[in-house]
Amino acid sequence: MRLFLAIDIPENIKEEIAKFQEQFKMKGIKLVEKENLHITVKFLGEVDEEKLKEILNLDLSIQPIKIKLKYIGTFPNSNYIRVIWIGAYNNNLVEIFKEIDEKLSNLGFKKEREYVPHLTIGRVKFIDNKKKLKDRIEKYKDVDFGEFEAKHIKLYKSTLTPNGPIYEVIKEW
């Protein structure tokens, strides 16, 4: 099964982001469904039942932290856009990631090189009008969705369908 760890976003902020995503409704861009908006902590990929049991036995709980959601960014860079995201800011987020990454590496998962806390709002399949997209990103680069308190890390199962992924919570720490 395909798994990832994430921090949920409060419903009111999801609503705001869903309205904001309208600015990026363009040919070639697949927007993330409102119910699927989250901050990915770590993508685990395909995991078998045995490894899942090991993950479920880990303590991945976190202390409550305030996370600011602001600014627009892109991966891998502004000249070759594949992902459009909103930044997630709190100095402890990177530390939380490192702790979780370390615990998972002990189970055989590959360590990540660098963690950029973010919330993906869209994936670019192809760009019909690169200038229009870059102008839109520039126009909204300082967007601010405020902050919220994160109290949990959730383990999600992701089932890919022709209509997009379906996420199911397996465990909450």
Curated annotation (Swiss-Prot):
Hydrolyzes RNA 2',3'-cyclic phosphodiester to an RNA 2'-phosphomonoester. Its EC number is 3.1.4.58. A motif (HXTX 2) lies at residues 118-121. It comes from Methanocaldococcus jannaschii (strain ATCC 43067 / DSM 2661 / JAL-1 / JCM 10045 / NBRC 100440) (Methanococcus jannaschii). Belongs to the 2H phosphoesterase superfamily. ThpR family. The keyword rRNA-binding does not apply. It comes from the Archaea. Keywords: Hydrolase. One of its GO terms (cellular component) is cytosol. A motif (HXTX 1) lies at residues 38-41. One of its GO terms (molecular function) is 2',3'-cyclic-nucleotide 3'-phosphodiesterase activity. The active site is at H38, H118. This is RNA 2',3'-cyclic phosphodiesterase. InterPro entries: Cyclic_Pdiesterase, Phosphoesterase_HXTX, RNA_CPDase. It holds the Pfam family LigT_PEase. It catalyses: a 3'-end 2',3'-cyclophospho-ribonucleotide-RNA + H2O = a 3'-end 2'-phospho-ribonucleotide-RNA + H(+).
